[in-house]
């Protein structure tokens, strides 16, 4: 999850919420629903119940958690067969965060090429879009610690 640089309070809150989802088993449930197995297992170890300091909540619009993502990357984020409903691991994670923070969740579907520009302009509170952590992104944005482990493979023609 990526947030604007300097939004450290919100980053701490999101980290605590993710830890809470690990602690209560919900993160594993979401992963198993979308991947068929718990791809979060072993990524984080949370042994004590985290607390959420909602005084650190900082959003673009009161009462809403606005999420930037690109709905074309199943099983992370995509649309259902009708094309009207967003579904996927990241969608369910965002909904859980919204519920924990007492906020309505709004999704902004955008192209990945422009997703960080939208965050910079304040069009959404955070990016939840299977963003890889790179040194360049860590320099420019606040980024959560990893919360999912998926394997990448290269496929070639025989």
Describe each model-derived feature in a short phrase.
Residues 1-5, 41, 53, 123, ...:
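Ligand-binding "clamshell"
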Residues 5-6, 35, 70-73, 81, ...:
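Solvent-exposed coil/turn segments that connect beta secondary-structure elements
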Residues 15-58:
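Ligand-binding clefts/hinges and TM-proximal coupling segments of bilobed small-molecule sensing domains
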Residues 11, 77, 116-117, 136-138:
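Extracytoplasmic/secreted cell-surface and envelope-processing proteins
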Residues 29, 53-54, 60-131:
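Extracytoplasmic small-molecule ligand-binding "clamshell" domains
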Residues 4-12, 21-25, 84-92, 109-113, ...:
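Soluble non-cytosolic domains of exported or imported proteins
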Residues 1-17, 152-158:
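A bilobed periplasmic-binding-protein/Venus flytrap-type ligand-binding module shared by bacterial periplasmic
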């Amino acid at each position: 999850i990526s947030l604007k640089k300097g939004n450290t309070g919100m980053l701490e809150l999101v980290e605590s919420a993710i830890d809470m989802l690990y602690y209560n088993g919900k993160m594993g449930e979401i992963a198993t629903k979308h991947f068929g197995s718990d791809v979060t297992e072993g990524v984080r170890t949370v042994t004590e119940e985290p607390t959420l300091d909602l005084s650190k909540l900082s959003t673009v619009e009161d009462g809403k958690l606005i999420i930037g993502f690109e709905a074309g990357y199943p099983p992370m984020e995509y649309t259902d067969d009708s094309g009207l409903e967003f579904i996927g691991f990241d969608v369910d994670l965002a909904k859980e965060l919204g519920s924990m923070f007492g906020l309505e969740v709004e999704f902004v579907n955008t192209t990945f090429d422009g997703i960080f520009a939208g965050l910079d302009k304040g069009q959404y509170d955070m990016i939840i879009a299977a963003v890889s952590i790179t040194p360049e992104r860590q320099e420019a944005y606040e980024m959560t610690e990893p919360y999912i482990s998926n394997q990448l493979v290269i496929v070639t023609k025989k």
